[in-house]
């Protein structure tokens, strides 16, 4: 499947995604396609409380996967939406997202299209990923903020390097001495 990007108004990504899914299902039910807005989980602080929120991975972009982009483009063109700005093009044809870029994005997201929380263990400047979507992508982590529970990762998109924050759970290894000093209640 080939992947393409649609440029839309910021904040309207989910609305455009839902509209396109309905249009494609109605006008082209036999065609294989996928429309998604990748998201990332993130810890944010509001009024002193830590909240887990979802943010769009690439604001203003909706990703379309299909082998029939011209047909899907015609459906979009005939049912104009004020939220769609344009389809990204390369010269006179549609700009295809590089297979290496999209494969990493697809591997990182879950079935709901979200990059979830990864459990990490930081010991003496060395990062060990215990589980989560980053388990096979240690090399894309550029910075860890243990206090905020965030990791800055590098994701290539449309031939550009994008740095985005995602949620991580920072684990600690306990020394035997600290375990012995704990008080147990019965």
What label would you give each PLM region?
Residues 132-134, 144-149:
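Short, conserved beta-turn/loop elements at beta-strand boundaries and strand-helix junctions
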Residues 2, 130-138:
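Short coil-to-beta-strand transition motifs
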């Amino acid at each position: 499947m080939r992947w393409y990007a649609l440029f839309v108004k910021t904040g309207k990504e989910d609305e455009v995604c839902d509209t396109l899914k309905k249009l494609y299902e109605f006008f082209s039910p036999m065609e294989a396609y996928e429309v998604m807005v990748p998201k990332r989980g993130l810890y944010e602080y509001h009024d002193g409380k830590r909240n887990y929120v979802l943010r769009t991975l690439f604001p203003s972009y909706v990703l379309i996967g299909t082998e029939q982009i011209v047909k899907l483009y015609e459906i979009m063109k005939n049912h104009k939406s004020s939220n769609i700005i344009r389809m990204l093009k390369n010269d006179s044809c549609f700009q295809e997202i590089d297979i290496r870029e999209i494969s990493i994005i697809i591997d990182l997201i879950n079935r709901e299209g979200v990059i979830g929380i990864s459990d990490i263990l930081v010991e003496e400047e060395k990062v060990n990923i215990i589980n989560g979507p980053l388990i096979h992508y240690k090399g894309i982590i550029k910075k860890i903020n243990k206090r905020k529970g965030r990791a800055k990762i590098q994701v290539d998109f449309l031939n550009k390097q994008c740095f985005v924050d995602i949620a991580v759970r920072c684990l600690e290894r306990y020394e035997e001495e600290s375990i012995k000093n704990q008080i147990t209640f019965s």
